[in-house]
Amino acid sequence: MKQMKRRIINIASYEKPTFCKKLKGMTAFILTTVLIMGLTPFISTYAADESRYQWKSSSENISYVDFSKYFGKYEGSFVLYDLRNDVWSIHDIEHATLRVAPDSTYKIYDALFGLEEGVITPQDSFIAWNGENYPFEAWNADQTLQSAMASSVNWYFQSVDEQLGASDVYSYIQEIGYGNENMSGDFSSYWMESSLEISPIEQVELLTKLQNNSFGFAPENINAVKDAIRLSSSDTGTLYGKTGTGRVNGQDVNGWFIGYIETADNTYFLPPTLVQTAMLPEATQLK
């Protein structure tokens, strides 16, 4: 465990000079790094009416840990998956199976769907800006998969969806088993604090399938997505990840960082999430 912590710290501490400018939700990423360094928990809010992932935990190798002292006023769970040893470390299984909106973390798979259908390709992922004025300067420009993922450009992935069509998107969501597979929300925002939800454990399972290409998709498409979510590299390994921020009435209520660290001899999957408990009543009412 100490060796793993050291590797995570070394990788996470290396950042390109322009990284802060390129990645939307950098605050969430910094928080994640701090949490990792202290082996502190993934934090989430609890709502009795939220759907849950029915995980067959009895067939898994799980180490249950107690990180209660780190929570303060929050409730939640910590999830870590060690791929080589096939071991899960979990604090609070109830929160680890709780499904919430994926927000921009879903863009990993939306991009993959677009690549599989040829809407974009690894060689040509260009989509022209339509001239509409967006709240973030980086969004007001033509985009490629790399730039759209780095700046979390909503309109780029909405354009991919529009070209795919709801039927094809839903087929892919079912094929990979994405969370609750619920696209009943508005087609432009079903993944943004709407109908589509996923749990931290499911996020890890899907990232594992992405890493191993258990989907059976074209290898060049898998690699294109992995390249788009690569955050930093060092001699000890490479950090991949994606942030996601949920907003209700102009306030951030749900922040994700999902990702994994690939070293020479292992891969560690890390999906911490932070939700402000004070915002929960308003957020759940608006879902």
Describe each PLM feature range.
Residues 2-58:
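Cytosolic-facing loops and C-terminal tails of multi-pass membrane proteins
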Residues 45-68, 72, 162-167, 208-236, ...:
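Structured C-terminal helix/loop/strand segments within mature extracytoplasmic catalytic/sensor domains
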Residues 47-102, 118:
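Short pre-catalytic segments that frame enzyme active sites
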Residues 91-97, 141-142, 150-157, 184-191, ...:
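Flexible glycine/proline-enriched surface loops and loop-helix/loop-strand junctions
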Residues 99-124, 148, 270:
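Active-site SXXK
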Residues 112-120, 162, 205-212:
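Short glycine/serine- and small hydrophobic-enriched flexible loop segments
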Residues 115-132, 218-221:
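Short, well-structured active-site flanking segments
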Residues 137, 144-145, 157-208:
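Mid-domain, small-residue-enriched loop/turn segments at the edges of structured enzyme/sensor domains
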